[in-house]
Regions:
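Secondary-structure boundary elements
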Residues: 2-57
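Flexible, surface-exposed loop/gating regions in the mature catalytic domains
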Residues: 43-71, 75-78, 95
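Hydrophobic/aromatic-rich core segments of domains that either
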Residues: 67-139
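Alpha-helix capping and helix-loop boundary segments enriched in small/acidic/polar residues
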Residues: 3, 59-63, 87
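Conserved small/polar residues in nucleotide/adenosyl-binding loops
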Residues: 171-180
Length: 180
């Protein structure tokens, strides 16, 4: 267990290397969002017990929504951004809310990790931002339902240019260099 804990801490610290001191809260939240997506593939495989945990994300590089959410929460805490979990029982889904300035916003790292529509495989290195820094109203428009939150009412980031970008991320390049 101690070896896994050490490996996990090392992997978390590796992820944090993409954060630069001069970055704003939004930039930190985005670069860590992109890092997780660039280094993790979605899995719903029930045989993969780690899929529900940060170990699945940081050490196995495979996780489901709970694993992505737990990993993102750890990274947000490490960079001083308040974070909490949001879930929908009917969707059987989990994601985060983070606080930027004095406002809360939804972030669904899982749904921003693009999958090939034909064979449902991860599109390695591709990142979406449709579910990054969203109001509750926008989340409902992106097919999230059966969740309650009174906090995420600000629409400040709902129509930002990055919502329509689905591309190779900056962190993909760094992650690729680290792996090879």
């Amino acid at each position: 267990i101690q070896k896994t804990r050490t490996q996990l801490n090392d992997a978390i610290n590796q992820a944090l290397l993409v954060v630069e001191p001069s970055m704003s809260q939004v930039e930190k939240a985005m670069v860590l969002h992109d890092y997780l997506i660039s280094t993790t593939a979605y899995t719903s495989n029930a045989g993969n017990a780690f899929r529900l945990t940060e170990v699945g994300v940081f050490l196995k590089h495979k996780a489901n929504c709970e694993g992505y959410s737990r990993a993102y929460a750890i990274l947000m805490q490490k960079v001083g951004i308040p974070v909490k979990f949001v879930s929908s029982n009917k969707m059987v889904h989990m994601w985060n809310e983070i606080k930027i300035g004095q406002k809360w916003y939804h972030v669904d790292v899982t749904w921003d990790d693009p999958m090939d529509a034909r064979d449902k495989t991860d599109q390695y290195g591709r990142v979406s931002h449709q579910n990054f820094l969203c109001s509750a109203a926008r989340m409902r428009k992106t097919k999230h339902y059966d969740f309650s939150t009174a906090d995420a009412t600000s629409t400040k980031y709902d129509n930002r240019y990055w919502k329509s970008i689905n591309t190779v991320s900056y962190t993909h390049l760094r992650a690729h260099e680290t792996r090879h």
